[in-house]
Each structure stands twice: as C-alpha cells, then as structure tokens.
Amino acid sequence: SGKVEIELVQYKPEAVDIFEQFQDEFNATHDDIYLKIDSPNDAMTILKTRFIREDNPDIIGIGGDINYSNFLDADMLMDISDFEGLNDIKEKYLEMNKDLEYVPKDGVYAVPYMANAAGILFNRDMFEEHGWEIPTTWTEFTNLCDQIQSEGIQPLYFGFKDTWTTLAPWNAIAVSLCDSDLTYQVNSGKTTFAENYREVAEKEKALLTYGQK
C-alpha cells in the first residue's frame, strides 16, 4: 500500500474504546501512515517478552511507574528531545518524567499525555440528608467517619477487587506526608522507607476500620 505502519501498544484495556477512536481518527486523516493500536490484557508481560526478542513496537503507552524506569535504565527508549509537541506540555509533568530515572540521563524519553487524580467520591444527597460537613483535614475526616459509623452506616467503600486499586489511598496519603525525592534519599542511604512510611501505613490501617469487612 506504500503506507508507513506505526504500532502502538498500550497497557490500559479499560481504555480500548477511546484508543480505537484515536486510531480511526488518525487513519482517516493521514493517507501515508497507518496507525495500529494494540491493547492486550497482559500488556506489560507482552512488552517485556517482545523487548527480549527485539520485536519492539514503535510506541508504548504505559504508566510512570517502575516498568518505565526499568525500560529507561536498560536503554530501551529513544530520546525524543526534538519532538515539537513537548512545547505544549507543562514543565512540571516533564520534571516528573526525570524523577523516574534511576540514574539522571540527558534527554527526554516520554510524552506525558494524561494525569490521574486521587480523591474520595461521596454521596452528596446523604451528606445533605444527615447534615454532614465536608472535611478538610485528616482529623475532621476520621471524626466524620466515626460519626457516620455511629449512625449505623458504613463510612467508606474500597475498590479492592484489583490489587492496583489498593494503592489509591496509600498514594494520596504518602504524597502529603513524604518528601517528593524520598526514593533518591533512600537510594543514597540517607533514610529508609520503613522510617518514612510508618505514618502512612498507620493512616492506611486506620482507614480500613471504616470500610467493608
């Protein structure tokens, strides 16, 4: 066909529909390029296997986690410093990319294209019905949970069906209590995770008393 085929493998199967939409829109507007987006269920295992076999996709869509750090450390990713689209990305997100490097490297190796928010969803109707005030501090939050529990209502519901969702409350607490460069401090021998995560773990444990059994 004479078209250049670009393969993108991304690791969020729950986002298949939107990525398929991106694929269709791109292909409809580019006559000389065919974009193929794969969203396999076990994407990370598949990616690691393909890297070992040197069957690398052109683009990968993964999170800013340890897998990204490992791929970067193994020199699996290409420097894209000359990509003009980087000018449209907030500097803070690019700095977060650099924070994921085990050893500081020159260049840019990822394009941040989305950000997640950690928070708590609440039933507004129930709050209005019971006269509960929206808490703004940890103490106000736990006091409210105690009050709700005393009224015979389960205060919290945790989405722990998948293991990764257990990180949501942990991350939200840790980012407020720990230094942003904690990993670097630990790697340089200045401190330990055990020392810094104790309060985080205690607060996470406290939350569990308000959730489902």
Predicted segment positions?
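Immediate post-signal peptide segment of exported/extracytoplasmic ligand-binding proteins
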Residues: 1-7, 28-29, 105-107, 128, ...
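Short, well-ordered beta-strand elements
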Residues: 2-13, 33-38, 59, 109, ...
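Solvent-exposed loop/turn segments at secondary-structure junctions
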Residues: 13-16, 42-44, 65-69, 116-119, ...
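Extracytoplasmic "Venus flytrap"/periplasmic binding protein-like
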Residues: 25-93, 125, 129-130, 136
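Loop/turn elements at helix/coil->beta-strand transitions in domains of secreted/extracellular proteins
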Residues: 31-33, 54-58, 107-108, 149-155, ...
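Hinge/lid segment of periplasmic solute-binding proteins
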Residues: 63-118, 142, 168-171, 196
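Extracytoplasmic/periplasmic solute-binding protein
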Residues: 104-113, 118, 142-190
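Glycine-centered hinge/linker elements that transmit conformational signals in sensory
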Residues: 147, 187-213
